[in-house]
Design a protein with these regions (language model features):
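Residue-level signal for functionally critical sites in structured catalytic/ligand-binding pockets
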Residues: 12, 16, 22, 43-47, ...
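Short, non-transmembrane cytosolic segments of multipass membrane proteins
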Residues: 1-29
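Phosphate-binding glycine-rich loops and adjacent basic patches that engage nucleotide phosphates
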Residues: 1-4, 93-96, 137-139
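Selected alpha-helical membrane-embedding segments in polytopic membrane proteins
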Residues: 20-126
């Protein structure tokens, strides 16, 4: 075993986590209170080389994973209560992160497909990736609020009634995205942002029933 490479890997990992911790608050606050900035920031970073992108703020996907997927995974593991050893925890985290990422992907995927369908631009791999990044920034605050109340529900079922607030916030943030990306007026953007809720609304109701039902 090359201990030099091992220590270097540990050093790089510790440094990377420290950077994430430092950049997380300002990235989340910016995306929460300045949604137009997130779209502009992604467009500006898209002009750079891939290795030079998202140096000042967390990348959209990483922000989305930290504030949406990770808290939901933690709340699900805690709710199940089947962790009896460190190995159980590691296994639950591995499986939980994958499943929660797939569940959380439904929201940006629905909006991306809907936006591309309503737009006039040709669908390309590069444009889809940029759109995914924009939606990750736009949806992170709403999914963070949902994750927060999902965790608080573990202590008091009263907080479950705040879960629909995330859908309202989601629509608000998506209005900014539709207005900027499709160059449409507010009323039309609001309509476009609401329509996908016909798909996502039943999913939210199912999740609320999941949290209400006894384990």
């Amino acid at each position: 075993m090359d201990f030099g490479k091992l220590f270097q890997s540990i050093e790089d990992a510790v440094y990377e986590v420290m950077v994430w911790i430092l950049l997380l608050p300002k990235t989340l606050i910016r995306s929460m209170f300045r949604p137009r900035w997130t779209i502009q920031y992604v467009n500006e970073e898209w002009e750079k080389q891939p290795d030079d992108r998202f140096d000042e703020y967390l990348s959209p996907v990483l922000l989305w994973l930290i504030v949406a997927v990770l808290p939901l995974t933690a709340s699900t593991i805690w709710r199940n209560g089947n962790i009896k050893s460190l190995q159980d925890l590691v296994s639950a985290l591995h499986d939980g992160l994958l499943s929660q990422a797939l569940y959380a992907m439904i929201i940006p995927f629905t909006y991306i497909v809907w936006m591309e369908w309503m737009g006039t631009r040709p669908v390309k791999k590069s444009t889809l990736k940029r759109s995914f990044y924009i939606h990750c920034y736009a949806l992170a605050p709403a999914q963070f609020i949902y994750s927060l109340f999902a965790i608080l529900t573990l202590w008091n079922d009263f907080f479950i009634y705040f879960l629909p607030l995330s859908s309202l916030l989601l629509v608000i943030y998506e209005v900014f995205v539709f207005r900027t990306e499709l160059k449409i007026p507010f009323g039309k953007a609001l309509l476009y942002a609401i329509v996908p809720q016909l798909v996502l609304g039943p999913l939210l109701l199912w999740l609320i029933r999941f949290y209400i039902s006894p384990m």
